[in-house]
Amino acid sequence: MVVNIESGPLESFLMKHVIFDCDGTLIDTSARQYQLFAGIKELIQELSPHCLLYVWTARGRSSTLRILEELGVSTYFDGVSAWEDSLPKPHVEGLQNLVGLFPRDSVCVIGDSPNDIIGAKNFGVLAIGALWNKEAQRDFLEDSGADFIVSHPSECSKLIEQNLKAE
């Protein structure tokens, strides 16, 4: 796990915590050259002043960090849990490593796959299903227990504001 939290421990407990899946949620891996999905950078920039942001991925750590750096968003993230850091999704170990100390009602996961949603629900946090990836399927996200399903990153901010508590 890589963590570079700038705020102190007390401030961390007073913030909301948003965990993004990497491939298919943050990054469009179907493109010839990896790119952020439309609206993702704006969402990250909007959330970062009042949320701690993390990446929970089945991708390797060095690859994840390199891609986030190349796409100009690495500095927005306070932690990364990659495949070598924990048991594979949907196991909750990666989430525990990232935000295990924080109240569950201050945490959400945004992901495009059933494993993202199942992991979030097993961990006891809000799960937002992301449909902006053309491979994502609404019925799979619904069947996995997503609390909300959204079609564009811009829909996430209001849900996070209304449904997460900053303790």
Where are these regions (language model features)?
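Active-site neighborhood of HAD-like aspartate-dependent phosphohydrolases
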Residues: 2-38
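Glycine-rich phosphate-binding loop signature in dinucleotide/nucleotide-binding domains
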Residues: 13, 49-51, 101-106, 163-167
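Conserved SAM-binding loop
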Residues: 26, 53, 109-110, 149
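Short, acidic loop-to-helix structural element flanking the phosphoryl-transfer center
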Residues: 34-55, 61, 65, 92
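Surface-exposed amphipathic alpha-helices with a cationic face
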Residues: 41-49, 99, 117-122
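A short, structured active-site edge motif that brings together acidic residues
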Residues: 74-89
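Conserved Lys-Pro-Asp/Glu-containing loop-to-beta segment of HAD-superfamily phosphomonoesterases
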Residues: 89-119
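Acidic, Mg2+-coordinating phosphoryl-transfer loop and its flanking beta/alpha structural elements
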Residues: 108-148
